[in-house]
Amino acid sequence: MGDGSSSRSNSSNSTSEKPEWLQQYNLVGKIGEGTYGLVFLARTKTPPKRPIAIKKFKQSKDGDGVSPTAIREIMLLREISHENVVKLVNVHINFADMSLYLAFDYAEYDLYEIIRHHRDKVGHSLNTYTVKSLLWQLLNGLNYLHSNWIIHRDLKPSNILVMGDAEEHGIVKIADFGLARIYQAPLKPLSDNGVVVTIWYRAPELLLGSKHYTSAVDMWAVGCIFAELLTLKPLFQGAEAKSSQNPFQLDQLDKIFKILGHPTMDKWPTLVNLPHWQNDVQHIQAHKYDSVGLHNVVHLNQKSPAYDLLSKMLEYDPLKRITASQALEHEYFRMDPLPGRNAFVASQPMEKNVNYPTRPVDTNTDFEGTTSINPPQAVAAGNVAGNMAGAHGMGSRSMPRPMVAHNMQRMQQSQGMMAYNFPAQAGLNPSVPLQQQRGMAQPHQQQQLRRKDPGMGMSGYAPPNKSRRL
């Protein structure tokens, strides 16, 4: 297919050659690629011609159709709706090869690139208002997920998006639900799903082989992200032994222990039950660490509210680790500067907004992901989704909404989703409504959804007997 130019030109001469769904969009180019597949930037042809991120999944490893990971992501995203969670706009199937495309609202930025820009280009840290606003919105979205019994299981800076357009400028969106799971009374240990969470953000109970874990693993990851926003570098940069499927990662634990100190039975009573602590093949129990102290690494006063919140997120014992709901009520968010809905407005009258770079876009490709021969180019802000340094004065800054779970209603099933039997492909009974299979609350019950697992910090609270399945 060459560089994709000729095939794209031919298809543009005859739109009838394109699938009907594809004719809804004007392709801008490829903006990402990973183990899951490709991500494209497109614009809707109908006004207001908004930017859309289209995620194309690779075929399943067995070559027999749509990836189960993609199906699980769809099944979750179609059920949730919240300002701080990425919005699934549509699902498209190319029946010629059964390739799957998910369409999302496009986010111009992510925390990984924002942090890197400050570290490598700007040369100074993010201001307190921006850090606080980004963190509050992340916790707000996570609280919604946990209230609906969903663990994300892969929180990291690159999966935390930030909108760049005018209407939602500076709003955080949690993305990438490929590893997310329903977690109330699982039918089997979650450890059966294999290794989860990128290693630098992986909770110690996972590293030590816990078979049953809770939403507390997400809160550990948020703590790591919080520290990274403060220091512009990952807090625990362990080297992963990728050749092994064993969850135990000695170097990562070593990095954690050197900063937080050695865990003890007094602080973490259930530590003795974790397989890799119990077996102690690597003799980690006897190893002594001279902790440098978390406060010294993140440069925070130990009596400051910011340090108090961070230390509670990085609590060893998952039963004692702060929850998203509790974190939203923390003193840190009640002090000036208060967090806002737009994380990127200036925190001081004379302060300049940071001009973050737009995403590089490979414009020499098509929706099949044909390899380009030219390097990707950054598309001008006016042609994509807006520039960070636009006219966003102090008047655009707004206070966060009340700290409750917002927009609990679920997304309506679109026609694009109706075209494929997702429940059957996901191993669910298509004749039974999804809400019944998952134990999802009916509309009149939705406000009663609350986390009641041990990760809530409610020690001694027995999980409900109702099953939640995916």
UniProtKB/Swiss-Prot annotation:
User: Which of the residues bear the PTM Phosphotyrosine?
Assistant: Y36
Q: Which Gene3D superfamilies match?
A: Phosphorylase Kinase, domain 1 (3.30.200.20), Transferase(Phosphotransferase) domain 1 (1.10.510.10)
Q: What does the tissue specificity note say?
A: Expressed in roots, leaves and stems. Expressed in young dividing tissue, such as shoot and root tips, lateral root primordia, young leaves and flowers. Expressed in the inflorescence meristem, inflorescence stem and young flowers.
Q: What is the recorded name of this protein?
A: Cyclin-dependent kinase E-1
Q: How does it assemble?
A: Interacts with MED14, HDA19 and LUG. Interacts with KIN10.
Q: In the Enzyme Commission scheme, what number(s) does this protein have?
A: 2.7.11.22, 2.7.11.23
Q: Which domain of life is it from?
A: Eukaryota
Q: Which GO terms describe its cellular component?
A: nucleus
State any GO BP term from the record: cell division
Q: What is its main location?
A: nucleus
Q: Which UniProt keywords apply?
A: ATP-binding, Cell cycle, Cell division, Kinase, Nucleotide-binding, Nucleus, Phosphoprotein, Serine/threonine-protein kinase, Transferase
Point to the regions of Polar residues compositional bias: 432-448
The protein's matches in SUPFAM superfamilies, at most eight in alphabetical order, are given as: Protein kinase-like (PK-like) (SSF56112)
Keyword Nucleotide-binding carried by entry? yes
Which residues belong to any copy of the Protein kinase domain? 25-333
Q: What job does the chain carry out?
A: Involved in cell differentiation. Required for the specification of stamen and carpel identities and for the proper termination of stem cells in the floral meristem.
Where does the record place it?
Nucleus
Region labeled Disordered — which residues? 428-470
The entry marks the following residues as binding ATP, namely I31, G32, E33, G34, T35, Y36, G37, L38, V39, K55
Enzyme active site:
D154 (proton acceptor)
Catalytic reactions of this protein: L-seryl-[protein] + ATP = O-phospho-L-seryl-[protein] + ADP + H(+); L-threonyl-[protein] + ATP = O-phospho-L-threonyl-[protein] + ADP + H(+); [DNA-directed RNA polymerase] + ATP = phospho-[DNA-directed RNA polymerase] + ADP + H(+)
